Amino acid sequence: MYLELVKKNSVILDKDGNKVKEVELPFIFSFPVRKDIIRRVFLAEFTHSLQPKGRDPMAGKRTSAESFGINLGMARVPRVKNSGEAALAPNTVGGRLTFPPSVDKKLVEEANDKEKQLAVISALSATADKVFVKARGHVFKDSVSFPIVVTDDIVSLKTASEVEEFLEKIGVYDDVKRVKERIRIRAGKGKMRGRKYKESIGPLIIVHDSNSPIVKAARNIAGVDVVNAKDVSVIHLAPGTHSGRLTIYTETSIKILDERLSKRLVS
């Protein structure tokens, strides 16, 4: 059984949001969206960044505590010599953990290389579908067509205000406003650990050059990420396993993605 794909067309916009021309998109934007593969590969890539952790084997055990025995009218928990203070047992203050974290725990999920490639293709295809982008919660003007492809000169934008103006002109700045309004303080101890605020996911800009000025210009805009087409993965395209991120492509980045992934569809 063969999968028959039909190529889509897309309009290319300039910095000011004006239509420049229409181009035919590669097959990677016509692939069926496989949520199951996207989820599997996202979890595989996400868990590869996790660090094993354990506990000191002697934690909670550095004490002289022993049980005084039975028939003394008191609990049989271990007690410190010359003190009588309960220690060592899991139900005591400063006692050991019953089941401490182990470095032997298997944290990393696995996925095949072919699955990883298909997941990226599938996630790219979701970014070209207005239904998926809307369902993910992104906000944009009704006139916006997907996928959003722009001319290569947008990579020369040097300031955050220029990038914001560009996003306004192509009709997706409302999504940045949505992210700004939803920045909130995290519940729990994460506040003490350098991650005080929670921020939603906003637009993704895929470029063809990692050293272009827009990479630094956009990094302080709420929710916006800039990624090289050579490095883009399911982590960027489907954060939290949810496909359909609002994505903006440069014209050359489309060609790079086609060279990188189209062989997977042929084979």
Swiss-Prot record:
Short name of one Pfam family: Ribosomal_L4
Cross-referenced HAMAP family: Ribosomal_uL4_A (MF_01328_A)
Gene source species: Saccharolobus islandicus (strain L.S.2.15 / Lassen #1)
Family label: Belongs to the universal ribosomal protein uL4 family.
Keywords associated with the record: Ribonucleoprotein, Ribosomal protein, RNA-binding, rRNA-binding
Stored PROSITE patterns: RIBOSOMAL_L1E
Gene: rpl4
Record has Ribonucleoprotein as a keyword: yes
Biological process, per Gene Ontology: translation
Protein name: Large ribosomal subunit protein uL4
GO molecular function: rRNA binding; structural constituent of ribosome
Function as written in the Swiss-Prot or TrEMBL entry: One of the primary rRNA binding proteins, this protein initially binds near the 5'-end of the 23S rRNA. It is important during the early stages of 50S assembly. It makes multiple contacts with different domains of the 23S rRNA in the assembled 50S subunit and ribosome. Forms part of the polypeptide exit tunnel.
InterPro entries associated with the record: Ribosomal_uL4 (IPR002136), Ribosomal_uL4_dom_sf (IPR023574), Ribosomal_uL4_euk/arc_CS (IPR013000), Ribosomal_uL4_euk/arch (IPR045240), Ribosomall_uL4-arc (IPR019970)
GO cellular component terms, A-Z: ribonucleoprotein complex; ribosome
